[in-house]
Amino acid sequence: MWQLNENQVYLPPPTPVATIVSTDEYVQRTSLYYHAGSTRLLTIGHPYFELKKPNGDVSVPKVSGHQYRVFRVRLPDPNKFGLSDTSLFNSETQRLVWACVGVEVGRGQPLGVGISGHPYFNKDEDVENSSVYGTVPGQDSRENVAMDYKQTQLCIVGCTPPIGEYWGMGTPCNASKVSPGDCPVLELKSEVIEDGDMVDAGFGAMDFASLQANKSDVPLDLCTSISKYPDYLGMAAEPYGNSLFFFLRREQMFVRHFFNRAGTTGDSVPNDLYITGSSNRASIAGSIYYSTPSGSLVTSDSQIFNKPLWIQKAQGHNNGICFGNQLFVTVVDTTRSTNLTLCAATQSPTPTPYDNSKFKEYLRHGEEFDLQFIFQLCVITLNAEVMTYIHAMDSSLLDDWNFKIGPPASATLEDTYRFLTNKAIACQRDAPPKEKEDPYKKYKFWEVNLTEKFSSQLDQFPLGRKFLMQAGLRTGPKFKSRKRPAPTSSSSSGSVTPKRKKTKR
């Protein structure tokens, strides 16, 4: 008896899958190098929250040592450079791009540990060295608790923004069956890391504003924020490798204290996991345990900043090419998170004797950065294959280079009116061309403009001298020695020509 073959037949894709290649395959590097550096970059604000005016405008921003600093570095268009060597590239078929070969992130300010806390922190019992079992918390048992955070140093370099991940509120399959007080549904989300986003402080990468309704389970700077962790897996798997040329990180943490939470335990401990007690242990104590983090010792021996970093080979397919004439540098440094305590007297002169009510205390946190780069000039030959590849990666690049890929021929019949100024017909005026939109305009970055900061005199800058030394390159002497020319017969009228010595043969 004939039977239908139930094995599935897999058909090949209708179009061939494009192969992702390294930028080294179509980018030719030149021998021209440039240095570019920022000015001293400073920011200062309140370490826990932003201060607002009565109309809602921000008067003092939130500036914490546990925030991401995402610098969007703007580079000049190399195709508009006035190069002395006109034979370097053909403007008809080639375009110039920058390749980042060196970077140094400078950090100012002394090493220090900043702490954070909450005046209404959800701390019930000390479960590390408990002396009393299962005290029943009152209606409000929150306490004033402070702690230091996990220690993190991080530097990510790419030509597109970095991606972060966190646990957020998910959508349940049947929303109608969700009751108040049910455990929220979790979903792993990936988003662009923006300047000012909070790092993982030791309480996990999550949306605290959505997942902690009491606003008391974490310190003030986290309770209404989203803590993001770099999505290293996602950025490493990116086909073109634009968001992550390389990264350096150093993380450390240990647990300082062990507590449990006050409140009704949502997931009760199963009865088969314990034997019922008696007396003051008849009711089982709370089992929502948690720990307070600590980053431990801060030392200059473990610093990853204030050092030159050289890009020989990127981990992805993009080997340091700055497409779009921009670079994104993401920095985290919690080893300089000291919070400054300021005090102002409410009366003048300073009141005596001392009275606490006559002084106001304030908190501020300041940060200092300096960015230095070494860029190499590169050439891309735009043949049909390369243009198709770049168009698939980012179609806006060809528009920036004044290359257009024509639309396919239309088979429909189009209308063309004879009299364009005829009031009897609809307006035939062409719509004005749309301005190019910034694909990252909805994100917040620290803008750093280096369009007028490029210099080919590498030996005039600290990072440039380091690059020349490690590359084995030497610059010519700045001052040429001037020797006195030898006298000639016409230089002095009284000169005597020496006689030629005779030799015997």
Curated annotation (Swiss-Prot):
GO terms for cellular component: host cell nucleus; T=7 icosahedral viral capsid. Residues 474-505 are annotated as: Disordered. It is found in: Virion; Host nucleus. It comes from the Viruses. GO terms for biological process: endocytosis involved in viral entry into host cell; virion attachment to host cell. Keywords: Capsid protein, Disulfide bond, Host nucleus, Host-virus interaction, Late protein, T=7 icosahedral capsid protein, Viral attachment to host cell, Viral penetration into host cytoplasm, Virion, Virus endocytosis by host, Virus entry into host cell. GO terms for molecular function: structural molecule activity. Its main location: virion. InterPro entries: Capsid_L1_Papillomavir, Capsid_L1_sf_Papillomavir, dsDNA_vir_gr_I_capsid. The keyword Ribosomal protein does not apply. Gene3D superfamilies: Major capsid L1 (late) superfamily, Papillomavirus. Residues 486-497 have a biased composition (Low complexity). Belongs to the papillomaviridae L1 protein family. Forms an icosahedral capsid with a T=7 symmetry and a 50 nm diameter. The capsid is composed of 72 pentamers linked to each other by disulfide bonds and associated with L2 proteins. Binds to heparan sulfate proteoglycans on cell surface of basal layer keratinocytes to provide initial virion attachment. This binding mediates a conformational change in the virus capsid that facilitates efficient infection. The virion enters the host cell via endocytosis. During virus trafficking, L1 protein dissociates from the viral DNA and the genomic DNA is released to the host nucleus. Self-assembles into homopentamers. The capsid has an icosahedral symmetry and consists of 72 capsomers, with each capsomer being a pentamer of L1. Interacts with the minor capsid protein L2; this interaction is necessary for viral genome encapsidation. Interacts with protein E2; this interaction enhances E2-dependent replication and transcription activation. This is Major capsid protein L1. The gene is L1.
